[in-house]
C-alpha cells in the first residue's frame, strides 16, 4: 500500500490520535495476518467485535490501532466513530493517490470469472491488482484498494451486494474509470425483493463513476433502458452472445467440449479465434465482457486472446474433473441461482455419456422460491439430461417435476446411491450444483474419493 502517517489517517477518518506519530506501510483487520509494524483496525460486526483481539495484536508487535473504544494500549491509537467506515475512508484516499485505471464489476452471476479473465489479460500489459477470491463487500473492496501502489497500472475490483446501498458505498470508494454490469438475474431476492430491485441495486455502481468514463453493458440482460439516465455522459460498449446487430463484441462458431470452449470473437478491431479453459455459454459471455474491458484500455487483440487462454480455472465453478476415462465430474458447487442453474443444464446436456444433475437448494430466492425450483424441473425436462438427484427442502420441487428424478434426505445416502450409478455406467457425466449454504462440495469430495479407490 501507499505509506501514510497516523496523523494523516486521523485526518482522513476524522479521528483523534493518541500517542506518537508513525509511518504505516501495512493495514490489517485480521490478527492472523499481523506483521510487526502494521496498523490494526478493530472492526465491529453483527456477530463479532475485533477489539477483543487487541491484546493478541500487541503480542505480535502491532504498531498502532484504529478503534471505536478508548482501550489505552501501550502503543499509538486512533479513536474513530466507526471503524468500518474508517477503513473505507483510508482506502478511498489511497485510491485517489494512484494513477491506476480502476475497473469495477457487478452483476448477479459471473463477477469473479470476469474479474479473473480481465486481470489475466491486463497483467500482460502492466502491474495489476484484483479482488482476492470474491471478497467484494464493504470490507473486501477497501482491503483490495489498500493494495494499490504507485507502480500499479490497473485495478480490477468486484462489487457485490446482498441488499440496497452496498454497491453505492463501494463504488464511491473505488471511483472506477470503467464499469460493467455483467447481468441481472434472480439472485439474493430476499434482500432485493424483486428482479427490479436487483437491477436498481446493481445500478448503484454508476454513483462512483467518473465523468466521460466507459460503461460496458450486456445486451443479453434486458435492463439497459432503466440505466440510460445514469450513463448519458459515458462511452458505452455493448456485448452479446445473441444480439449481433447492436453489439461491439459478439461471437460465432461456438464449440463446447469436455476441456473448455472455443469461438470466434467479433470486435470493433476485427475478429479473432478464442479458446477458453472453461465450460459453458456464460463463460463465453464473461470472456466478451473481459475483452470489452480490455479493449476500452486499448489492449491489443493478441494480448486479449493470450490472457483469456491463461486465465486460471476458478475452483467450483463448472470445474471439469476427469475421474476416469469416459467418466467426468463437473464441480459447480460454489453457488447457485436460477440463471446459473439453467446454464449448468445447458453445459451438462452437451457432455458425453449418461448425464446426471445432482442439486441442492437454490437459496435466497424469497417467497417465489418454490416456483423457481419448479421452473428448473421444467427446463430440465426439455433438456437431454437423463437423471436428477436432489437434496434439500426446495430442490425436491425440481425432482417432482422432472420425469426421472430422485430426492434424498441426507448427503450420505445420496453419495452412496450416486457412487453405485457411477460404478455401473461405462460413460457418464455428473454435474453437482447448489447454493453455498448447501455445501454440495461434500458430494464432489465423496465421488473423488471413490474414484481414487479404484486407482
UniProtKB/Swiss-Prot annotation:
Known function: Involved in cell wall formation. Catalyzes the final step in the synthesis of UDP-N-acetylmuramoyl-pentapeptide, the precursor of murein.
The keyword Iron is assigned to this record: no
Protein family membership: Belongs to the MurCDEF family. MurF subfamily.
Chain positions recorded as ATP binding sites: 107-113
Keyword list, A-Z: ATP-binding, Cell cycle, Cell division, Cell shape, Cell wall biogenesis/degradation, Cytoplasm, Ligase, Nucleotide-binding, Peptidoglycan synthesis
Protein name: UDP-N-acetylmuramoyl-tripeptide--D-alanyl-D-alanine ligase
GO cellular component, one term: cytoplasm
EC number per UniProt: 6.3.2.10
Keyword Cytoplasm: yes
Species whose genome carries this gene: Buchnera aphidicola subsp. Acyrthosiphon pisum (strain APS) (Acyrthosiphon pisum symbiotic bacterium)
Amino acid at each position: 500500500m501507499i505509506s501514510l502517517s497516523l496523523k494523516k489517517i486521523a485526518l482522513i477518518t476524522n479521528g483523534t490520535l493518541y500517542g506518537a506519530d508513525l509511518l504505516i506501510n501495512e493495514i490489517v483487520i485480521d490478527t492472523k495476518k499481523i506483521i510487526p509494524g502494521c496498523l490494526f483496525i478493530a472492526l465491529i460486526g453483527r456477530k463479532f467485535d475485533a477489539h477483543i483481539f487487541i491484546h493478541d495484536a500487541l503480542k505480535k508487535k502491532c504498531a498502532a490501532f484504529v478503534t471505536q473504544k478508548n482501550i489505552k494500549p501501550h502503543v499509538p491509537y486512533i479513536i474513530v466513530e466507526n471503524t468500518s467506515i474508517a477503513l473505507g475512508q483510508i482506502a478511498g484516499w489511497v485510491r485517489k493517490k494512484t494513477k491506476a485505471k480502476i475497473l469495477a464489476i457487478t452483476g448477479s452471476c459471473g463477477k469473479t470469472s470476469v474479474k479473473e479473465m480481465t486481470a489475466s489479460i491486463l497483467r500482460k500489459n502492466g502491474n495489476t491488482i484484483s479482488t482476492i477470491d470474491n471478497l467484494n463487500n464493504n470490507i473486501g473492496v477497501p482491503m483490495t484498494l489498500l493494495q494499490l501502489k504507485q507502480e500499479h497500472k490497473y485495478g480490477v475490483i468486484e462489487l457485490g451486494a446482498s441488499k440496497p446501498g452496498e454497491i453505492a458505498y463501494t463504488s464511491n470508494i473505488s471511483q472506477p474509470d470503467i464499469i460493467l454490469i455483467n447481468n441481472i438475474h434472480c439472485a439474493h431476492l430476499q434482500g432485493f425483493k424483486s428482479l427490479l430491485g436487483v437491477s436498481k441495486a446493481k445500478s448503484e455502481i454508476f454513483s462512483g463513476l467518473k465523468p466521460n468514463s466507459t460503461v460496458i453493458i450486456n445486451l443479453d440482460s434486458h435492463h439497459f433502458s432503466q440505466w440510460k439516465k445514469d450513463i448519458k455522459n459515458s462511452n458505452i460498449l455493448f456485448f452479446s452472445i445473441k444480439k449481433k446487430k447492436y453489439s461491439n463484441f459478439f461471437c460465432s462458431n461456438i464449440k463446447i467440449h469436455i476441456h473448455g470452449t472455443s469461438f470466434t470473437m467479433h470486435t470493433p478491431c476485427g475478429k479473432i479465434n478464442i479458446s477458453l479453459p472453461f465450460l459453458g455459454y456464460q463463460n463465453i459471455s464473461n470472456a466478451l465482457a473481459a475483452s470489452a474491458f480490455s479493449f476500452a484500455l486499448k489492449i491489443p487483440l493478441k494480448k486479449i486472446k493470450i490472457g483469456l487462454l491463461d486465465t486460471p480455472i476458478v475452483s467450483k465453478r463448472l470445474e471439469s474433473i476427469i475421474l476416469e476415462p469416459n467418466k467426468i465430474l463437473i464441480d459447480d458447487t460454489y453457488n447457485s441461482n436460477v440463471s446459473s442453474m439453467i446454464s449448468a443444464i445447458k453445459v451438462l446436456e452437451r457432455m458425453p455419456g449418461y448425464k446426471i444433475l445432482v442439486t441442492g437448494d437454490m437459496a435466497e430466492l424469497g417467497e417465489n422460491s418454490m416456483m423457481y425450483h419448479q421452473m428448473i424441473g421444467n427446463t430440465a425436462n426439455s433438456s437431454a439430461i437423463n437423471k436428477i438427484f436432489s437434496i434439500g427442502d426446495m430442490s425436491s420441487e425440481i425432482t417432482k417435476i422432472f420425469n426421472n428424478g430422485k430426492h434424498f434426505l441426507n448427503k450420505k445416502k445420496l453419495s452412496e446411491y450416486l457412487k453405485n450409478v457411477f460404478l455401473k455406467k461405462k460413460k457418464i457425466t455428473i454435474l453437482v450444483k447448489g447454493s453455498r449454504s448447501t455445501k454440495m462440495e461434500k458430494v464432489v469430495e465423496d465421488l473423488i474419493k471413490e474414484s481414487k479407490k479404484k486407482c
